[in-house]
């Protein structure tokens, strides 16, 4: 999950019944700041508020997990409050309560499980800062990435037969984010998502991530992870065409194309010394090509 500098967190202490509340740990980051579209104008307006309620819940839980000021104990306690509020056992966390009520109102209470899966990932973010191998990272992504796409598919009443392709794309997006932010995640939170065995195989060390230019071994480790990500994107290449809802299909096509381009960039550029992102013009160009391909396929 993407980190944030401690100074960007609100210093105000918001408490509920003398206990730290998630609202005290907000980063101020919104859906416009994410690396990929979140409920963009392409999504059916009927579904957009539901997806945004899920996003607000996930964003707040992510902020809690990534906060570098609150103690581990406090962060885990807040995440537990979010869980109990989502399941209806309590009402201590407003964003979780709003999400639960939104889902029940729209007959989507069966999708609450996706929020619970996300909370498992955020608990791991608090407690785990290294991943031994690719399989361990993929297991983490099963909770941190796949539930987001699965939720969107369920909201659109798409077939769960699409889940394998969804999981591949969502996992690829998560790994891309990890590689883009690998230096920041290490410096600010002592977190390394590049699997240890990949780094060890090429002689890269944790200290390499603390520099402002990637060493040759670290560049090799990043390239290895990026190549594995390309394999995930091959598995998701038919995803957008298989989606029944045309608007969602276009959005997924755009995301797939952006992910493919960013993965290629990560094999050629140093995320420690430069920002490996697309500017607005590049994003619009890629989006146009992807959208046209989906609409006229």
From Swiss-Prot:
Pfam family, one: SQS_PSY
Pathway: Secondary metabolite biosynthesis; hopanoid biosynthesis
A molecular function (GO) term: lyase activity
UniProtKB keywords: Lyase
InterPro entries cross-referenced by the UniProt entry: HSQ_synthase_HpnC, Isoprenoid_synthase_dom_sf, Squ/phyt_synthse, Trans_IPPS_HH
Residues making up the signal peptide according to the UniProt record: none
Domain of life according to the entry: Bacteria
Catalytic activity, reaction form: presqualene diphosphate + H2O = hydroxysqualene + diphosphate
E.C. number(s) listed in UniProt: 4.2.3.156
Enzyme superclass (EC): lyase
Residue ranges the record marks as coiled coil: none
SUPFAM superfamilies: Terpenoid synthases (SSF48576)
GO BP: terpenoid biosynthetic process
Its biological purpose: Involved in the biosynthesis of the hopanoid precursor squalene (SQ) from farnesyl diphosphate (FPP). Catalyzes the second step, the conversion of presqualene diphosphate (PSPP) to hydroxysqualene (HSQ).
Family statement: Belongs to the phytoene/squalene synthase family. HpnC subfamily.
Protein name: Hydroxysqualene synthase
Organism: Zymomonas mobilis subsp. mobilis (strain ATCC 31821 / ZM4 / CP4)
